[in-house]
Amino acid sequence: MDRRLVSALILIVAAIISISLYITLMPRQTQAARVVVYAYNDRVTGIDPSIEDDTGLVVLGLVYEPLLYYNPVKNEFKPALAVNWSSNEDGTEWVFHLRRGVKFHDGTPFNATAVKISVERARDIYRETGRGLGYIWDAVEEVQVVDEYTVRFKLSYPQRLDIIAAASYAAYIFSPSALVKSGASSPMDRALEEWFNTGNEAGTGPYMITYYRPDSEIRLRKFNEWWGWSIVNNPDAPDEVVIRIVTEPQSQYNGLIAGEIDVASSVPRDNIADLVKKGFKVFNLTTFHNYIMFFNVKRYPTNITEFRKAILHMINLDEAVALAMKGYAVKGSGVVPHGFPGHVDGLSYRYDKEEALKYLNESGVRTPVSIEILYQVDYEELKIFAEYLQSRLREIGVNLILKPQPWSQLKDTAKGVWENPESTPHIIIADWWPTIPSPYDYLYSMFHSDSKEWNFAGFEDPEFDELIDSAFEVEGSNYTHALLLYKDAQEKLFNEAIAVNLWDEIKPFIYSGRIEIPEEAMNPLYMYVISFQYVKVKT
């Protein structure tokens, strides 16, 4: 062979080898992580999966999973950690068959023991301390581990345990390894609660906590071994979710405009049309999130029924809702919101100044008189409503003193109605969203004499307690009768003017064009939770 040809071939081979080595050894360009920033409007109050009963849901709903999910609007169940379930004829025994191959975030396997420990802990903490929302498991007498992937529940009275197993609180399953990591001697040991609430977690959900500052920011990272990725089939899901605490609505608006926020939960409603013009999108979620105005029934003069009715007849609720909510709410009726099981129409007071003056005269309260109203400081709609009510009551000689407070302080102040009612404001406005799709959730949590965490009226009435307890106990066997009992309970609250539902919120979530939020990412039972595993991030 010609030497020149050989030399040329050698050079070509050398060049190919060099190029191959360069391609092999050169730094690989990695795809930028998909990061979504979600602006949430309240500090996170806790992330203990058994006990948390407030704003921590926004985190719990992504990090943990229940046995089932339920959408009350569609009346539809979706399997989560359980794949199928059944009950005996009278609803006193339920069997759940669990999903196989599921891992907790620390790599330990999910099994029936985890379900037993999680359910019993939520139930027993509530039974012993009244904390959390573990009352939902009240009927559960025994949780039996049949085998690694089968759990049997034995109940003391019939219940729709499928609905309870899909609750937004007190139904999340955590890994038993958390007991070892926290140094807890038992599931009831406070050391476990402290471990959770310092930013640790033990869930199976699609995202894991990597950074936890409940007053400012929580960061979540995609859990690549989540069992559901093959079902969701969304390669464009966020790799990281940043939940940023932004309490001021105007700051959420500014963050969207600056490109610092991708999803905002609470921009000023007056600015929504402007944001749409700028290319932002809106997901309007019809919710079961309502705003309750409680009267402190343990303090003069709101301990007088006629005085409470005088105040209520000075509210033109249609006018007030339009003013405060800018079209993003439905006027309340009864305590249970529209579209929710047990809602009752016609339980709202009409504006009638003559009627108000009549009741004021019957109350024996001399005017001028001053009373206080407590509401959350960073909710613009409540400020607007409080100022509206202040103006109206001035017409009948009632001076309304405004007492806005941050949520954590407000809650502590409101609970004072039980220990120190004379120092607790006469009127308290607080919001509520459901734990389970039952009227009992609203009526028990906010008005039962045993529920002192959320009963801001200080209302105690054995007849009322008996009505709703009886209703809950027959829900699983005679649902029609249960609804009638719940209706009677709501009428009692209305007739005695203990509290009123001001409005049921339509929640606008504003988001940038770089993401897509499909319908399956939002479920009104799990308020403020965006299921980011369904969200698509454009790159």
How would you label these PLM feature ranges?
Residues 39-89, 120, 202:
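N-terminal lobe/hinge region of extracytoplasmic solute-binding protein
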Residues 83-129, 146, 152-154, 301-303:
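Aromatic- and charge-enriched surface segment that lines or borders ligand/interaction sites
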Residues 71-72, 76, 168-236, 240, ...:
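Gly/Pro-rich hinge or "lid" segments in bacterial periplasmic/extracellular proteins
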